[in-house]
Every structure is written in C-alpha cells, then in structure tokens.
C-alpha cells in the first residue's frame, strides 16, 4: 500500500532566474498569470486567503482574485463573514496562488484596506443576477437550520428587488497592499527557485529582489 510519505513529484518544467525576472513583482505576476491562462489551467484566478482572528486563531479559504494593479490585489466578499471579522481586527493577510500544472506558487503578504464604494458598486453591478441576489440572501458564515431557509431567503430577495438588487452595505471589496511577494518555481531534487520581492522605498523600482534557499 502506498503511504503518504511516498507521494512525491520531481519538478522539472522550468527555472526562475534573477536575470529573467521582471524588476517589479506586479509585472512578474502579470507574466506568470498570462502563462497560466495560456496553459488553460482550471480557474487560475483562485487563491488561498489566510487571516487571523481576534483570538489569534488562523483560518484559510479559497477566494477569487478580481483585480491586480500597482496598488495591490483585489477580492470581494461579505464584510460580516468570518474573514471580514478577522480583517476588521487584524488588517493583515496572506495570499497564495498554486499552479501545480506549471509547478509554481506565488506567496503574497501585506496589509488590507477596503476598496472604495465606487469600486465595489462597479464590480457588484457586473455580477450575474443570481450572485447579486445571493449576496443579500446569505448571512455568510452564520449557522442556519436548513437549506430550505436559505432558498426561502433567496426567493424573498428576488421578489423584493427583481432584476436590479443594489449592493448590500455588508458586501464589498478588499485590497491587499503587498510588502512582500515570493515567486516559487519547482526544480529537481527539491532545489527549488525562490525569488522574494520586498518593498523598499530606497530602491529604484521600489522593490528589492532576494534569492531564498529552498
């Protein structure tokens, strides 16, 4: 019988060298994300979001990235969810993209800020109708007695707002403003390539690049 200790893959698809890396991490992320899209990976926009609650207990979940620019990485959620409460007391978080088919990870750490109401309104209006209704119907992370309760709420919201539900006040965007971004490329014999971008106001591009030992 195969044991967990025997499960392993020898990575060999690509390398990551300082000479080929972009001078700023957003350009490097854009390059890798486009390669993930070109490779037709299933949902390359999924990422793990890790937060810490008031009691110091960490939690993690998969969310979808909805925007990236030089300001940071944007996602949207219910502000009253567990992650919303975590971020209210500890506005620091970590993101992880894992593209196993390309043998790559991107690890991002930084502070969290809410997006503007205008940004949240604009994205909310672009969502499918069912998702907009669902944002009202679901008290995310709260205990409910049955699926029927959720479906009854969905029906009530649909009847109330029809085809034009407004954005709920408890729903909107967050932006992670990174202070470090690590790009990890799997290599043979577990001697992986790891390049860490650290925010540095004294550096010409605003970032320094360091190679980390695997």
UniProtKB/Swiss-Prot annotation:
Residues involved in FMN binding: 61-66, 76-77, 82-83, 105, 140-141, 184, 194
Highest taxon of source: Bacteria
Cofactor: FMN
Assembly description: Homodimer.
Cofactor: binding comment: Binds 1 FMN per subunit.
Species annotation: Burkholderia orbicola (strain MC0-3)
Family: Belongs to the pyridoxamine 5'-phosphate oxidase family.
Binding site for substrate: 8-11, 66, 123, 127, 131, 190-192
Job of this protein: Catalyzes the oxidation of either pyridoxine 5'-phosphate (PNP) or pyridoxamine 5'-phosphate (PMP) into pyridoxal 5'-phosphate (PLP).
One example GO MF annotation: pyridoxamine phosphate oxidase activity
Reaction it catalyzes: pyridoxamine 5'-phosphate + O2 + H2O = pyridoxal 5'-phosphate + H2O2 + NH4(+); pyridoxine 5'-phosphate + O2 = pyridoxal 5'-phosphate + H2O2
Keywords, alphabetical: Flavoprotein, FMN, Oxidoreductase, Pyridoxine biosynthesis
Protein name in the entry: Pyridoxine/pyridoxamine 5'-phosphate oxidase
